[in-house]
């Protein structure tokens, strides 16, 4: 993994997260009460800038359209579960990047992966409580959406330019 590989990965992640937050977060404002505190696009922008990507380039990155996939609260919950769950492994990813790329390369450039810092565990527990309450009775659709989100992310990251 090189710094350029990491920047390319963050660029793709930015397109997905930005589109998800823009189009799906509004569906969750009544289910996930602290949804406003879970926006992370700005952290990806900070990471990209730290890696030398200028604002004009960031602004031109594709904004994935999600309204067709996440039309219901259940679908939005499934997608949110995947995105919030990814932060649980963030500290491991950040440590790996520091080891591979060097502390001087990654310092201040892995804000997304350490979004909640020492509060990661408590934020996850709070999310799970709200998630379990909101998904009661619609578990099948939530699970299907989570699986679809994994599939969409896989396609997003493996598409050809």
Locate the predicted segments by residue.
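Metal- and O2-centered redox machinery and metal/ROS homeostasis
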Residues: 1-161
């Amino acid at each position: 993994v090189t710094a350029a590989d990491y920047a390319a990965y963050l660029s793709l992640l930015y397109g997905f997260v930005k589109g998800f937050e823009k189009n799906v977060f509004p569906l969750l404002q009544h289910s996930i009460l602290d949804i406003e505190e879970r926006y992370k696009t700005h952290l990806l922008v900070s990471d990209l800038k730290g890696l030398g990507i200028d604002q004009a380039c960031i602004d031109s990155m594709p904004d994935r359209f999600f309204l067709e996939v996440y039309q219901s609260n259940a679908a939005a919950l499934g997608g949110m579960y995947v995105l919030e769950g990814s932060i649980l492994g963030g500290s491991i990813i950040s440590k790996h990047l520091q080891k591979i790329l060097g502390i001087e390369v990654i310092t201040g450039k892995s804000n997304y992966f350490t979004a909640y810092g020492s509060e990661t565990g408590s934020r996850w527990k709070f999310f799970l409580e709200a998630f379990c309450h909101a998904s009661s009775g619609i578990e099948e659709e939530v699970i299907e959406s989570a699986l679809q989100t994994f599939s969409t992310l896989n396609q997003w990251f493996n598409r050809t330019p």
